[in-house]
Amino acid sequence: MECPVMETGSLFTSGIKRHLKDKRISKTTKLNVSLASKIKTKILNNSSIFKISLKHNNRALAQALSREKENSRRITTEKMLLQKEVEKLNFENTFLRLKLNNLNKKLIDIEALMNNNLITAIEMSSLSEFHQSSFLLSASKKKRISKQCKLMRLPFARVPLTSNDDEDEDKEKMQCDNNIKSKTLPDIPSSGSTTQPLSTQDNSEVLFLKENNQNVYGLDDSEHISSIVDVPPRESHSHSDQSSKTSLMSEMRNAQSIGRRWEKPSPSNVTERKKRGSSWESNNLSADTPCATVLDKQHISSPELNCNNEINGHTNETNTEMQRNKQDLPGLSSESAREPNAECMNQIEDNDDFQLQKTVYDADMDLTASEVSKIVTVSTGIKKKSNKKTNEHGMKTFRKVKDSSSEKKRERSKRQFKNSSDVDIGEKIENRTERSDVLDGKRGAEDPGFIFNNEQLAQMNEQLAQVNELKKMTLQTGFEQGDRENVLCNKKEKRITNEQEETYSLSQSSGKFHQESKFDKGQNSLTCNKSKASRQTFVIHKLEKDNLLPNQKDKVTIYENLDVTNEFHTANLSTKDNGNLCDYGTHNILDLKKYVTDIQPSEQNESNINKLRKKVNRKTEIISGMNHMYEDNDKDVVHGLKKGNFFFKTQEDKEPISENIEVSKELQIPALSTRDNENQCDYRTQNVLGLQKQITNMYPVQQNESKVNKKLRQKVNRKTEIISEVNHLDNDKSIEYTVKSHSLFLTQKDKEIIPGNLEDPSEFETPALSTKDSGNLYDSEIQNVLGVKHGHDMQPACQNDSKIGKKPRLNVCQKSEIIPETNQIYENDNKGVHDLEKDNFFSLTPKDKETISENLQVTNEFQTVDLLIKDNGNLCDYDTQNILELKKYVTDRKSAEQNESKINKLRNKVNWKTEIISEMNQIYEDNDKDAHVQESYTKDLDFKVNKSKQKLECQDIINKHYMEVNSNEKESCDQILDSYKVVKKRKKESSCKAKNILTKAKNKLASQLTESSQTSISLESDLKHITSEADSDPGNPVELCKTQKQSTTTLNKKDLPFVEEIKEGECQVKKVNKMTSKSKKRKTSIDPSPESHEVMERILDSVQGKSTVSEQADKENNLENEKMVKNKPDFYTKAFRSLSEIHSPNIQDSSFDSVREGLVPLSVSSGKNVIIKENFALECSPAFQVSDDEHEKMNKMKFKVNRRTQKSGIGDRPLQDLSNTSFVSNNTAESENKSEDLSSERTSRRRRCTPFYFKEPSLRDKMRR
């Protein structure tokens, strides 16, 4: 019992242990799974968090990047703007520096010169005497003079005090203060703004400097005057304590300051004064006269440029005499000062009406300390003769009285400002040549102290009233007339425009003064009245004229009347209308009319063309006739074009032409080249009265370009014969004349009229006409012919290129009898055109041919143009000589007709080497006859096949051999090509002539025979002889068929080194049923005709019937062939010699020697290449022409077969000798020894080299593989 108990216990324990182990394992697995799942979940969570965070980060980064880019862009743009601003500022700074430097230099120079010349100027001014002229003064003016005189007696009193005019003086004080402020401002943008800090001494120095140095400082006049004008009153007293002279100068400065206070009410007057003074200073620099005037109150109304200019001019006139007068100033009495002051004030008030404002240089002269110093103004004026000055003064006063009708001076200044000032200026300028003793009024008007202000045109603020003439000193100025003219022209322009700028840059003012300094004195007399201003003429320079004319768009016409009466030189009319350019260069033209009936731009072209009518000094009757003719033509043309888009030349058009033909010798119309939508029609016609061109485009032509040949500008003598010259008629998509009918008709009536009008047809030429409408080409060139040629293409041909070239120069010598014949031709043309629209075929009517043949005899002197028309890639090229008329109807729908057109081109050429051809024919006939004599038994075989089948088979074989050209054969052909080439022709010529031979007859000889064909014939006779022997044996047909296969297998390209590819002589006839193989290694043709298949089936059946042929049969055939060749060695050697010596001298003699010595027929490569390639390279070559064609063709068939039987015995010999252009290999023994290995080579070479025409149709695909 224990044993089982123990067993059960052990089992129990073992089970428990297993259970525990399982539990542990399960726990561990669970833990592992849970851990893996936890890790996985953590990884997933982390990855998702990472993804999200990455997305956010990327988004934030992208936004930040975009912001940064925007900021960078903004910064770059700002940087660019700042750089531009910096550049501008730098430029301005440099400009201002340069300006400042120039001004400083000028001021330094002026100061130095004034210091040098001041004493002399004072001396000149002191010598002058004061003259009184108070009889012209009104009561109001006298009051003002008295007031001003009081003011002058007190030089240091800034504010004038009078019992009568207290209020007025208060107002004047305010104005004076404003003037002082404006003068002190440094930033006034006037030309003389930088010259304000000058002292009054400098001002006086400037004045006298200009007097003495007129020509030197012409440029700096504006600056000098402005500096003088703008001197502040503080500086006037700077040098009062020095010497008597300096005291006098200080008094003058004080007087100037006081006068300026009265003169200028606003600071703007300062700049105006500078500007005006500078402008007139340069004008009137030369011929200065000293004038000393007492400065009283000057009431200046709104200043104006002209007056101020004149004022400055007069101020510049003080010379060395002024200095003398100034020296005499201290001795002047107060009375003498008062009297001229009164006179001057009268004139000054008159000048209020005229608005004459001139700056006055005041010199305060202190005679004694107790005396009331007199303010003497030294003004410069142009000195002229005294007589004219007196007249000037009288004229001035008279007009001043006129203008001073009203007492309200300011109101009158508004109304009469321009007229009065201009009148006074003009009078003064006219009378500058003479200086009168009384210069009071003139000095007041000429003083440079007057300054014009545009802001106060309505007010006459102040006047200079004190001008004292210097009786003793009269200086004449040397102004040039050109300078004065420029001054006046500038004045008038300024008066007309009424535009005045307050500020002038110093450079502008100086430049203006230079220009004004070149005007003439004569025009200075221009008055200021508007009526006079309208009458005066301005000298407009060429630049101004050029600027005026181009402003007129598309209407520019320059009329130039030439004195040459015999020649008319018309201006080039350049008209641009919507991109349409019409350029007419015409020489010796009475009239040119161009009618462009475009929908949009036609009217403008007509308007521009009509402007070319010039004055004709001689033959005005002809002109009227021409105009009448053109008007009639215009009416007829426009009417016809609107209705039917046909162009009919009526009898009315012809009559004036016939009337004017006699005169047409002298005329020459331009070549009219019109390009419509890139369609160019170029016409060059000479000695034609009128050229009318109607272009009816249904769409707006926006790119018309009419280019005129400048070659036509030639001098044409009246009585000289003009050889007409027609240049190229380039119709690049030209659209002309007709839209619907596509034709241009000349009525019978017109044809009758024109011949009568042609009195001398040798001296004129009708224009070449080119018409293309919606792709229909009408191309014709008419030379001394009355008619129109028509070409109609029913298909749209948008790229027709009709080129007529070679510039035929025709000289028709009294052939008027041709004209009626040409009329008949053109009648036929019109008929042919209508037939052409219906039938659409290329034809020449027999009647036309007859007329052409008749005209060929008469027109040996004509030379027609080569008419080359290309329509849809179809080329029709006609090289015709001595033809009166050529009519061409082109209705090409297919590209195949291009070759026919090429053939027609070459039909007129004469065949070359007819002697060689006849000689070859004799050789062929001799060879054939000898072959028949020796091979009479071959006649039985000739008649076994029907003649029809023989013809077809022969054609098939010929067509097949045409296409056989191997690439390796091409390489080897170059060695012999030179020896066989006698006549080189193009492929086109050979192809066309070959095709003609095919169509006419095969018996006809080809126009070109290469030497290879000739040699092949002599060689062919040998092989025919062999074939005859082979055929005589009854067992040969079977063996021949078999050996044919064997021989073809050995014909590799490597085995065919002696193949000549006649590159230029080889031709392929079109429209022949042929299929070229796709393989490039062999180019063979397959003729699907049933007759050829029958021949091949016969051969193949014979081959399949007896598949096993012994090599002994091959050897026997070879021996028999050799024997038959030995029978007639002389004939063949002669044939070889004759051909080699005559036609192929380059052929190696060793090859022929081997033939004569060995008397072995040609090897496989030579036989095949010479016979097949050479004999059939030329299509339909007469190599087989014998008395009986059928006999020859059968011999040819058999010859090919036997040639391969011959190869079977000899084909295994090495062929490296053949690469050296040897016809026969001398290694015959080796070939016989290697004949055993022929069968092994046949299988390997069969697929590569066996021609398809010896295989069944089912095997063709296999062979291609």
Swiss-Prot record:
Residues 69-116, 452-476, 603-626 form a coiled coil. Residues 190-202, 305-322, 503-512, 1217-1230 have a biased composition (Polar residues). Residues 1073-1083 have a biased composition (Basic residues). Keywords: Cell cycle, Cell division, Centromere, Chromosome, Chromosome partition, Coiled coil, Kinetochore, Meiosis, Nucleus, Phosphoprotein. Its main location: nucleus. Residues 161-202, 230-287, 305-339, 381-447, 499-526, 1073-1093, 1200-1265 are annotated as: Disordered. Cooperates with PPP2CA to protect centromeric cohesin from separase-mediated cleavage in oocytes specifically during meiosis I. Has a crucial role in protecting REC8 at centromeres from cleavage by separase. During meiosis, protects centromeric cohesion complexes until metaphase II/anaphase II transition, preventing premature release of meiosis-specific REC8 cohesin complexes from anaphase I centromeres. Is thus essential for an accurate gametogenesis. May act by targeting PPP2CA to centromeres, thus leading to cohesin dephosphorylation. PANTHER family: SHUGOSHIN (PTHR21577), SHUGOSHIN 1-RELATED (PTHR21577:SF3). Belongs to the shugoshin family. This is Shugoshin 2. The lineage of its organism: Eukaryota, Metazoa, Chordata, Craniata, Vertebrata.
